[in-house]
Amino acid sequence: ELLVVVAIIGILAAVGVVAYSGYTAGAKKQAAKSNHQTLIKYFSAELQKCNLGETKFIENSINCSDRFTNYKISQGAELVLNSKFKNPYKTNQGMPQHGSLGFSCSQNVMGETKVENKNNELQIQTCIDDTELLTFKIPIE
């Protein structure tokens, strides 16, 4: 009888672990999507500061006159990504910028984001899992 009880407990534990793994993977992907949407809103609002007459944006770290300069945008984005966001796949770090636009998603870059000015558009790309890359473009005026 004891052997049967132990076997049943083992089976239940195995099923529970598999179900829990699927649940956490889905939650991480949803958190990465949420981060991406929040970044879109954040950078849209920051760019509007310049249109409304402010002189600086992105944590007061960039002059509005530099909003068309790619490396300035990337520097400001790096500051925000590492201080205000967490990578749901690597919870001990912020959301570091990854390489350049159009990067390929893989296990190593899940949850990472790239923010860059390209052709006077602020482009935000986030790897929400190991295959799916979300992209959004905000016109810079």
Would you name each region that the model predicts?
Residues E1-T24:
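N-terminal single-pass transmembrane signal-anchor helix
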